[in-house]
Amino acid sequence: NNLHLKEILPVLSKSAGNAHILFFQNMWIDDLDSINKYLSEKQYFFGFPFMVGGGRDAGCIYSAISGLKQSHTPLGEPNGEISERVRKIADAFEDANLKPIIYNQIKIWLITHYAVAAGLSAGIMKAKSGRNFASNSDILKEAIKAIREGLEVCQKLGYNPKAVKANGLYFLPFFIAIPIAKKVYGNEALCLMFDGHTQHSPDEMKKMFEDIITDGEKHGVKVYILKQIKEGIFN
């Protein structure tokens, strides 16, 4: 996850050679800046495991692949080019039935997804599980409010959330958004993915909240809901 970038980037800078590096993880603005300090754009590109996830308990490692229509694997170059290397990795994902989509604005997808994931994670952690989250209208409403705060921060930073079609859900009136969210997030595979991520990466969740809150306050965005949920979970 993005907690390890500071450790791995100096190593990659010295040893990557002519390798093409695929960063396949959550990304916020400071992560993009850190990568640029160590690598040139010709050395790397981006993706995200949007339709796969999992976790483990004492006796089992489990994985999940979402079969939802909107699930896919985003890929893209930092500069938006549809390059040969992106096409090659897209072909590999296609062979694995992971539905790759090449974006010409992958940074916008990643940054706004970070905000969405933070808001969803806040709700899931408050509800104690993905299944509880998907069935609780009040927590879903609060999570959507948190997502809206995060997406407003993205907008202030120059990443237009409405450029990503999927973000439209979070701008709908609650009486429309909440029933849709219940149907989407009640998917069994998604619940497993949610639980795996939130239960096994609390430090990453905390960093996500802090990143958005810090940049929100810096740019005059009110992030009351995110702050309130973060304090309730981690204090």
Write out the residue ranges for each language-model feature.
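Short, solvent-exposed polar/charged micro-motifs at secondary-structure junctions
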Residues: G54-A58, L110-A115, P173-F175, N235
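Internal alpha-helical scaffold of NAD(P)-dependent oxidoreductase catalytic cores
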Residues: K14, Y38-Q43, C60-P161
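Glycine-rich beta-alpha junction loops
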Residues: W28, F48-G54, N79, I106-I108, ...
